[in-house]
Amino acid sequence: MHRTIFILSLLFLILPAKAQPKHEVRAAWITAVYGLDWPRTRATTPQGIRKQKEELVDILDKLRAANFNTVLFQTRTRGDVLYPSSIEPFNSILTGKVGGNPGYDPLAFAVEECHKRGMECHAWMVTIPLG
């Protein structure tokens, strides 16, 4: 009987050591409202597209260096979006005019760049704008 209790006690001590570690989410929002976080440059020329992408890469590099593992990337604001859509136009922050095609898919680019850094990328959509 004592041997069974001893073995069970050891088993209960060993099992938690084999359990998966908790996944800690260290996230940051990247907002496109008024270009507060991103972008600062308009994508109206090939140089503008390159600069806009570099700005996002720089933000992601800083987040990775600060040990973040998740990005909440704003993809929709007030009826406009940061990805190609047949329903809503591109956000004016990308090119300076509503519906202006920036020449690339900002959401796909953000996802790709996050994954290169081992980070998750979640689409953040404003559904109830206030103010």
Regions of interest found by a model, annotated:
Residues 20-49:
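Boundary/entry segment of secreted carbohydrate-active catalytic domains
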Residues 45-66, 93-117:
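Aromatic- and glycine-enriched glycan-recognition loops and surfaces
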Residues 37-39, 80-84, 130-131:
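Extracytoplasmic/secreted cell-surface and envelope-processing proteins
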Residues 22-28, 64, 68-78, 106-131:
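Glycine-rich, aromatic-flanked loop segments that form ligand/cofactor-binding clefts
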